[in-house]
Amino acid sequence: MNRQNISGTSPYEAIIGFSRAVRIGNVVHVSGTGPVGADDLSASEQTRHVLTLIESALHQAGANLEHVVRTRMFIAKAEDWEEIGRAHGEVFGGIRPAATMVIAQMLNPKWRVEIEADAVLPDAG
């Protein structure tokens, strides 16, 4: 089975040794994606920025947001849950992937959210 590594623009990829996304067959795993370059934005704006980065990685892997079956949201502060959740819902409200929200410390203290996503493309046959 072919493996396709997708690189993004995060400076952390080379340091930590990871890909923005990896496609194996018809499955795409998008790494935890933080709001790189959007540090000073609100929680909802950071979430929208992160989802744009995820969408770009999916497109590079031949997928799109409609193929997402699971997201994991890591949030820095419990009080941001609704703002982040609503921004997530703006994108995924009609798709409704399985989702989890966890409170976690961020790599960058200005980040309020980091999101992972898994997508499954339809079988070719």
Predicted regions and their residues:
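N-terminal presequence-like segments and the immediate start of the first folded domain
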Residues: 1-69, 75-125
